Amino acid sequence: MNPNKKIYISDVTLRDGSHAIRHQYSVENAVQIARALDKAKVDSIEVAHGDGLQGSSFNYGFGAHTDLEWIEAVADTVKHAKVATLLLPGIGTVHDLKAAYSAGARIVRVATHCTEADVSRQHIEVARNLGMEAVGFLMMSHMTTPQALAEQAKLMESYGATCCYVVDSGGALSMNDVRDRFRAFKEVLKPETETGIHAHHNLSLGVANSIVAVEEGCDRVDASLSGMGAGAGNAPLEVFIAAADRMGWNHGCNLYTLMDAADDIVRPLQDRPVRVDRETLALGYAGVYSSFLRHSEVAAKKYGLKAVDILVELGRRRMVGGQEDMIVDVALDLLKGHEHDAEHAIPTMSEAG
């Protein structure tokens, strides 16, 4: 890698971080966080419901505000950073993309499952026609091979994406997994096409994986204040910047401003600690979509189950983002299995009298 190359810092506190508090950021929260990030000189700030434009729904959870309210508030606040947003084809539409652009978004990350890049074409093309920066975002990147993932990135590039991401939605990639995926990208993408890493911290590898990605030539790094994000969170922004600083990398951010924002503004908003614990570790171990965490915990409480059991079964069934409705199905199947086991249990001597 070129140590003098400027690493593009993409903050996701106001989008992925929304998962951690069930999409309940107030507009005031968004403005305060955006102001701090802008002061710290991050390059972009992603803003949306955790599941992207129009994610606010019964299936994913309703947001405290609309995407446009958040985007407009942040766009009116920042002076340095570009406003980005996320769109999942099938949830967000071209109409929503145009509205986000009008509200102030200038970058869109079009997100698909890692084997379904073909559904991104319309949205990437429309984004480019609007004058937006279009980024391809390949979620659950651990679920396919490095070479197959690279071919999907090549499709997004052909549609007009100027940057393609390895997205570790489950926080399941090891450092060698990340290295192999970026090397595969390098083999097939044009030299001018940038690459990005979106890490989750479920195996405590969020920062390490981001560092490996940069060592392999990755241009953009996603991170969030105090790791605010789904599951055990994303790569903590202030930690990545501190590590990058120690390595002499050019990132352009003010570390102490980020440290203050993480501890004084973001961490107090968490109603469930964003950390590696029994449940979030299960996400990374089983390779489960990180935003399934809060939904699974609700289902576990409702049906008297362990959230870990639900998460591991979701991983076994290879469920992916967008299948949140299956969490209740899995819980009911597990409950039925427990009831069957109890009904057919062999009585002990004391129970038999």
UniProtKB/Swiss-Prot annotation:
Record: residues binding substrate? 15-16, 169, 198, 289
GO BP terms: namely: catabolic process; L-leucine biosynthetic process
State the reactions this protein catalyses: (S)-4-hydroxy-2-oxopentanoate = acetaldehyde + pyruvate
Q: Which Gene3D superfamilies match?
A: 1.10.8.60, Aldolase class I
Q: Please provide an example of a Pfam family that matches this protein in its UniProt record.
A: HMGL-like
Q: Where is this site: Transition state stabilizer?
A: 15
Q: What class of enzyme is it?
A: lyase
Record key words, sorted: Aromatic hydrocarbons catabolism, Lyase, Manganese, Metal-binding
| Domain (Pyruvate carboxyltransferase): residue spans on this chain | 7-259
Chain segments annotated as transmembrane:
none
**One MF term in GO for this entry?**
manganese ion binding
Keyword Metal-binding, does the record have it?
yes
Might you give the EC number(s) for this enzyme?
4.1.3.39
Binding residue positions for Mn(2+):
16, 198, 200
Q: Which residues form the active site?
A: 19
Q: Which CDD domains match?
A: DRE_TIM_HOA
Q: What is this protein called?
A: 4-hydroxy-2-oxovalerate aldolase 3
Per the UniProt entry, what species is this protein from, by scientific name?
A: Dechloromonas aromatica (strain RCB)
Q: What is the lineage of its organism?
A: Bacteria, Pseudomonadati, Pseudomonadota, Betaproteobacteria, Rhodocyclales
